Each structure stands twice: as C-alpha cells, then as structure tokens.
Amino acid sequence: MTAITNIAAREILDSRGNPTVEVDVLLEDGSFGRAAVPSGASTGAHEAVELRDGDKSRYNGKGVLKAVDAVQSEILDAIGGMDAEDQVAVDEAMIALDGTPNKARLGANAILGVSLAVAKAAAETAGLPLYRYVGGVQGRVLPVPMMNIVNGGAHADNPIDFQEFMVMPVGATSLSDAVRMGAEIFHTLKSALKKAGHNTNVGDEGGFAPNLPSAEAALDFVMESINAAGFKPGSDVVLALDCAATEFFKDGAYRYEGEGQTRSIEQQVDYLAKLTEAYPILSIEDGMSEDDWEGWKLLTDRIGSRVQLVGDDLFVTNVERLARGIETGTANSILVKVNQIGSLTETLAAVDMAQRAGYTAVMSHRSGETEDSTIADLAVATNCGQIKTGSLARSDRLAKYNQLIRIEEGLGAQALYAGRSAIRQLAGR
C-alpha cells in the first residue's frame, strides 16, 4: 500500500527567479507528496553539492534539468517499489546510488526533493500532518522566529557587511502572537527608515536593505523600532545576528569592505563581544569564518556562556563537522538547513546529535526559497524551539509563518510556544 510507484520532477523557479527542483512522489494507495528544494546565496564550502546544468544558453547556466533527469531515471529505478514509510532505507539507497561524499553526482537538490516528497506522501498515507508524522506525539513545541528585518552582505546591495539583523519575540505568549509582534516591529521600522530618508526596498529574505554605514547603525534602527512598536528590548524581544563572516574573511583577516575596516581574528572576537554588551544580542550566527576553528573557539570561550553561537557554514548540517565542534567545545548551536546535507534522514540525525550534546538547533530556510513550507513542520517535529525563515514580507517567507500558525491551531491546547526557554543563555534570566 505504501510502495513508491512513480516519481515526477520538474524545473520551477525560486524566489530569486532561478531554477530549482520540484518533486512529486506517488504511492500505491494513491497518496501523494510534493516538495520543492531551496537554494542559498552565501553557501559554505562544505555543503552538499547543488547540481546545476552549466548550460549558459539556459538560465545563465543555472538550469537543473540534469537533477530533474536524475530523479526520473536513476533515482526512480533505484527506489521505485520501496516502502515510503521506511524513510531511512529510501534515503540511504539514494545516498549509496550517488556514491560521492557530497552528493555531487546526482545532486543534493535531486536527492533532497525526493526525500522530502517521500516523507510527505507517507504522512498522507498515515492520515497525519507532516510534523506529527515525523515528530510523533512529542512534536508540539512552536519555535521562536528569528525575523530578519534588516539585510546586508550577500543578501543586499548596501555597505553593511553583516548579512542579517533579526528580532526574536521571546516574550510572546504564542507563535501567532510572535508573528504579530514581528510584523508590528517590521512596519514600524519601515516608517522609521522612510522618515530618515532611507529607501525601504527589501532584500532576498524580505528584510529592508537601507544604505547604512555600519552594523551599529542598523542595530540602532532596530532598537528604535522595537521601542516605538511598544515592546521592551531584552525582555519582550531580543536581537540576533548572522554575520556570515566567511564572506569577508580573506588572507587570515576579517575585511569589512563596506565599512572600510580590517579586523584580525582576535579583533573580530573583541568586536562581537562589545556588540553583545552594547545591545541585547542573544544569538550570533557565523561570527567567525567556516574554517577559522581557532577564532570560533576564542569566541565561544569569550561569550558562549551568555550568547547562543550558531554554526551555519561551520557545521553545514553535517554530523562529522558537528561532532568536531562538540568535541572541541566550539559554538553551542547548529543552524539546520535541509539542503546543506541533502536528505531528511541526515537532517534529523544532525538535530538529534546537537540536542544530545546540549547544543540548540535552529531550523532554517535559504535565501532562494519557494512556497514550500516543509521546514515549518520540521521545526515543530524536532522541537528545536527556533526557526529562521526571513522577514514579514515576501510570500515565500510568509508561507512558513502561515504554516506555523496553522500547526499551532491544529495542536490546540497541546501547543507550547518555546519563548525564552528556546535560548539556553536566556532561559535562566
């Protein structure tokens, strides 16, 4: 009844107008699952490989017809007839078929699309929403959103070197209340920027991309907007940064080209520490470069007891790199991006390893997204307590927030909003 009988794939467009892979999986009993694969702008060197065609005559070489063909030929031949309810076996079969350590032959975009669509089809067979199918009865924690309201770095065309400035409504009473708070801050910020003569265009993830001179200038606007919206910074709302430091780490130093500054590894640690003292910043993602393990350790020893330090490019949702971080006491949180590793099974393994080691996990989108809202379900299924899915603009971002609102409604009295407990450094305050 739950055997995989057909798999179809197609080339669709993501939120940046670039091609991506969408996969449909059909089961013997007629159950159906569909998944679309996201794509990143600032990608870590250690991520699984996203297979692109390289044909400059189509989509400037970014087509994904090779990945689509892999799904409908080799992958279908390999897993057709397998039981969709045996997710691990399905994913392992695709990984073995690919035969490379980073999914470079078939493409992580091909394998992930099938992996997620299989899970959705199996959930339909079971008559369960995806979060319940994956997480069981324990999946009931609604995550605190990291709402990216100011964009810089690779996500915007402005002088700000840091990639994301986010608000986290830890003082909300529910997920829907958190979304309301974020939306009110977002619109208040828009008014403040407009009043100060800045443009209110948005970046890839829906946050504003004003022509501000520094991180401090962006943080000041965010703080002003939190207060003006009627909330208390540090209590109702805390701040989070994604420095995406790999993007500006060159020749052993952190080169802030937008700000005209160069900082050594030690100076980068000092700078981030000072920012956390000046502003209610409780989470910093990729404050150091992906292979600057020395800098990461210095940063962790310096502020890790009071700030969540999230490894994105550092860990790339990979259990081998995460294990090294745990062993060396580097960072204390992992950003979870399904397409960094390329299958649902491996994603869940990374979350499990992190949680067992006392690390937090943050479920995350990519800058190139679609209307697919799978990560909302996975955030609840894994009880990770935090989700990073962009700003309060652009339907590709709002699809995830709206799905979380639906999940919260479906859970009813069982729903539990993570709130202050989501960040361990904040929970005891």
Curated annotation (Swiss-Prot):
GO terms for cellular component: cell surface; extracellular region; phosphopyruvate hydratase complex. One of its GO terms (biological process) is glycolytic process. Its cofactor is Mg(2+). Mg(2+) binds at residues 242, 285, 312. InterPro entries: Enolase, Enolase-like_C_sf, Enolase-like_N, Enolase_C, Enolase_CS, Enolase_N. Its EC number is 4.2.1.11. It catalyses: (2R)-2-phosphoglycerate = phosphoenolpyruvate + H2O. Pathway: Carbohydrate degradation; glycolysis; pyruvate from D-glyceraldehyde 3-phosphate: step 4/5. It comes from the Bacteria. Keywords: Cytoplasm, Glycolysis, Lyase, Magnesium, Metal-binding, Secreted. It is found in: Cytoplasm; Secreted; Cell surface. (2R)-2-phosphoglycerate binds at residues 163, 337, 366-367, 388. The active site is at residues 205, 337. Binds a second Mg(2+) ion via substrate during catalysis. It is an enzyme of class 4 (lyase). Its main location: cytoplasm. GO terms for molecular function: magnesium ion binding; phosphopyruvate hydratase activity. Belongs to the enolase family. Catalyzes the reversible conversion of 2-phosphoglycerate (2-PG) into phosphoenolpyruvate (PEP). It is essential for the degradation of carbohydrates via glycolysis. This is Enolase.
